Amino acid sequence: MKLASLLVGSLMLAVPALAFEQSAIQTLRDATTATGAYHSKFPHALSEGPEAAISNINSATARAADEAKTAMTGLTVQSQSLAGALKGVSWISPHVLVVLFMPKYGVLTMFVWQFFDAMTTLSHDATNPAVFCSKNIDRLGPSMGWNLRLPHATTLKRDCKDGEKLVADLAGSYKIAVDSLEQAQAMLESPQGKCKQ
């Protein structure tokens, strides 16, 4: 009975903790879209000449950087909250569980050990969204067995993959912004650019 109560209580904490809030994913999606809109304007800015290009691209790059910073800050806060929740779940040592319950409950104790071991591993990696998504979602499933049948599991896996893609897209878009800025600076410093000043 004690073991059942312990497991149920832990799951009440764990299940809500495992779901990234949609707002974090949406923030990334919005930032990626906005950044894409910014860097799509760069070729036109370059065609207007070095001085216009450097001004427009500086502005667009700064806005893109702000979007990226806001998005990543939001996701970091989400993942840190997740880490805290998971650490709260995993405070019981598996060794204590074995000493207390193994003689009487046997295999069930091993299941609980796997569960808390998975929680501990998740708590260590949760502050890194990419590591969390790529390494631990699938790791938790085999440890808990029935986890992948929970209603939130499919959505969670999809959002993590989506989130990873959005992070990569955001980084790629920001690189394009920086590359375009460097291109504009090079034009401005070229003989042709100096002639237009």
Curated annotation (Swiss-Prot):
Its main location: secreted. It is found in: Secreted. GO terms for cellular component: extracellular region. Keywords: Secreted, Signal. The keyword Secreted applies. Residues 1-19 form the signal peptide. This is Uncharacterized secreted protein ARB_03673. It comes from Arthroderma benhamiae (strain ATCC MYA-4681 / CBS 112371) (Trichophyton mentagrophytes).
